[in-house]
Amino acid sequence: MSSSDEPCKGTKRPASPDETGSTQWQSADLGTDERKQKFLRLMGAGKKEHTGRLVIGDHKSTSHFRSGAEDRRMNADLEHQYQQSLDGKLSGRNRRHCGLGFSEPDEVAESPNAAVSETSNSSETPPEQVSETQKEEKPPASDTELEKPEPHTHSKEDKKKTLKMAFVKST
C-alpha cells in the first residue's frame, strides 16, 4: 500500500481565484440585476456607484444659497451659543452628579444681592429711618440665646423626619 502504487483520484484546486477577479459571489444566480447588486453590496463585494470624493455643500439638490449677511448672522449666532456653553461649563453653573441631597448654599448667591438691596435702600431712605430699620433687623442677644437651645429639645422622630426631608425635594 505505498503511495506510488495507487493512482491519483482527485485534482487540486488553484490557490488563488481567477485572474479576472470574479468569485463565486459574483457568479451567483440571484435573479434580477438589482437583487444581485444588493447582495454584493451587503456581502461587501460590490462596488459603489460614487467612487470619487464628494465635496460637502456641492450637491445638485442644493436649491438655495445663503447670502453673505445671512451667513455672517448664522456664524455670529453659533459663536454666541458656543461662548455661552463654554462660560456655563467653566463657571460650574450646571453642576450635576454632585451626590444625593446635594444643594449649593443659598447664602453665597443671596449675600451679594442682599448687600446691593441694602445699599439701594439706604440711598433712598433718610438717615433717621435707616437707623430704625437697622435696629429692627438686629434681634436682641437674649432672643438668639433662646433660639439656640430649641433644636436640642426636638424628639428623635422629629430629627429623623427633618433628615429624610432634607434628601427628598419636591420638583
Swiss-Prot record:
Pfam families cross-referenced by the UniProt entry: SMAP (PF15477)
Annotated family: Belongs to the SMAP family.
Keywords, alphabetical: Phosphoprotein
Protein name listed in UniProt: Small acidic protein
Family matches, as InterPro entries: SMAP, SMAP_dom
Biased composition (Basic and acidic residues): 46-80, 133-160
PANTHER family: SMALL ACIDIC PROTEIN, SMALL ACIDIC PROTEIN-RELATED
Organism superkingdom: Eukaryota
Naturally occurring in which organism (per UniProt): Danio rerio
